[in-house]
């Protein structure tokens, strides 16, 4: 009888994947990133173990957005106090807080648990083409 192999956290082998966002659609990039961070592309995927790869996104500010999302889409924050709702347009977030925008969007695609937060820490986003992880990168997507 064959048994399913369950991966232990000590047996996980992680790769560093580089994604160039220039000219690619924002949402398509993020679905690929969420899959890589979760580890679902690996045959040894185990849902209760963080078996995903490290992902480095470069040229994040050069991603494409379809339609009029840059002017219309808004992100809301609330501190919990009355009247403290703040909103920022997608275009402003892309200019000023590119890294935060990508992490916020990917966070919605990952599990809402401590495991999901652990996966999100493996995402590195850079607005330009320069990044400090050149030595670690061993794959390009």
Swiss-Prot record:
<protein>
    <recommendedName>
        <fullName>Large ribosomal subunit protein uL13</fullName>
    </recommendedName>
</protein>
<dbReference type="InterPro" id="IPR005822">
    <property type="entry name" value="Ribosomal_uL13"/>
</dbReference>
<dbReference type="InterPro" id="IPR005823">
    <property type="entry name" value="Ribosomal_uL13_bac-type"/>
</dbReference>
<comment type="subunit">
    <text>Part of the 50S ribosomal subunit.</text>
</comment>
<dbReference type="GO" id="GO:0006412">
    <property type="term" value="P:translation"/>
</dbReference>
<keyword id="KW-0687">Ribonucleoprotein</keyword>
<dbReference type="GO" id="GO:0003735">
    <property type="term" value="F:structural constituent of ribosome"/>
</dbReference>
<comment type="similarity">
    <text>Belongs to the universal ribosomal protein uL13 family.</text>
</comment>
<comment type="function">
    <text>This protein is one of the early assembly proteins of the 50S ribosomal subunit, although it is not seen to bind rRNA by itself. It is important during the early stages of 50S assembly.</text>
</comment>
<dbReference type="Pfam" id="PF00572">
    <property type="entry name" value="Ribosomal_L13"/>
</dbReference>
<dbReference type="InterPro" id="IPR023563">
    <property type="entry name" value="Ribosomal_uL13_CS"/>
</dbReference>
<dbReference type="GO" id="GO:0022625">
    <property type="term" value="C:cytosolic large ribosomal subunit"/>
</dbReference>
<dbReference type="GO" id="GO:0003729">
    <property type="term" value="F:mRNA binding"/>
</dbReference>
<dbReference type="InterPro" id="IPR036899">
    <property type="entry name" value="Ribosomal_uL13_sf"/>
</dbReference>
<keyword id="KW-0689">Ribosomal protein</keyword>
<dbReference type="GO" id="GO:0017148">
    <property type="term" value="P:negative regulation of translation"/>
</dbReference>
